[in-house]
Amino acid sequence: MTDNDSEYIRQTEATRVRVLSEALPYIQQFAGRTVVVKYGGAAMKDSTLKDKVIRDIVFLSCVGLRPIVVHGGGPEINSWLDKLGIEPQFKNGLRVTDAATMDVVEMVLVGRVNKEIVALINQAGGLAVGLCGKDGNLFTARPQGQEGIGFVGEVSNVNIKILDTLASNGYIPVVSSVAADETGQAYNINADTVAGEIAAALGAEKLILLTDTSGILKDYKDQSTLIPKVDIREARELIVNGIVTGGMIPKVNCCVRSLAQGVRAAHIIDGRIPHALLLEIFTDVGIGTMILGSQFTS
């Protein structure tokens, strides 16, 4: 071993010790607290990123947090619709979900994507349980109300008992965003919305949305204009003033709604960064945008 090798090892080990030391107060602060993670975007498609997200989720559980995962699966839904000769259609950013499409959405989200995530968490040493809204009436649906979009729903009610029971016993609930209304009709619900409503119902410490952007940017073309922290009032103003636009609007609105119902902090982070979850939760600087409820800004 050369002197350069020895120096590199010393520096690497020193960095690891510093990172662990920096994480300790956050681990102590958040022990026993619930963190709802919306898992989607590139972090679901890239196998290397997927492995790191799964390991992060298991790490959260191992150090005493109570992670709950809500996942999307749009690209895989589109892939299966294509295989079955059904053309994906969208209206105002929402997937038009007729009866045939709803069958595919449920098959893919509940039967494939959910079970893959569960298996990966279990392989990484966690204890995951797969659920959708229909299981134990975890959450029920109502029509979204927009004409011409079919079985696209909103969350009507959340029953937290099953989540509390699982999380308090060391299990990691993995939730797909399919639910039924009071007649038993299945609905496709936006996964961000489901994550926000579950976080609100549980009074979660954090709602974290893994996205394909750095967070909220003052200039969406310039990654260096990341806004690291805002409160709920400032977040609303960013929408009104046109700083937050396009697909970021429903994500920020989802965060604002959950904060207004008692979630302490919401985070929009870049899931393309390896170990994004741990970097956001357990480091002083973080990597994305944190939105705080007005009662917690001090």
From Swiss-Prot:
ATP-binding as UniProt keyword: yes
Pathway: Amino-acid biosynthesis; L-arginine biosynthesis; N(2)-acetyl-L-ornithine from L-glutamate: step 2/4
Top EC group: transferase
Keyword Amino-acid biosynthesis: yes
Residues at which substrate binds: 73-74, 95, 188
Molecular function via GO: acetylglutamate kinase activity; ATP binding
Coiled coil: none
CDD domains according to UniProt: AAK_NAGK-C
Catalysed reaction equations from the record: N-acetyl-L-glutamate + ATP = N-acetyl-L-glutamyl 5-phosphate + ADP
Any GO BP annotation: L-arginine biosynthetic process
Residues of the site described as Transition state stabilizer: 38, 251
HAMAP family xrefs: ArgB
Function: Catalyzes the ATP-dependent phosphorylation of N-acetyl-L-glutamate.
Protein name: Acetylglutamate kinase
Species this protein is from: Nostoc punctiforme (strain ATCC 29133 / PCC 73102)
Lineage, broadest ranks: Bacteria, Bacillati, Cyanobacteriota, Cyanophyceae, Nostocales
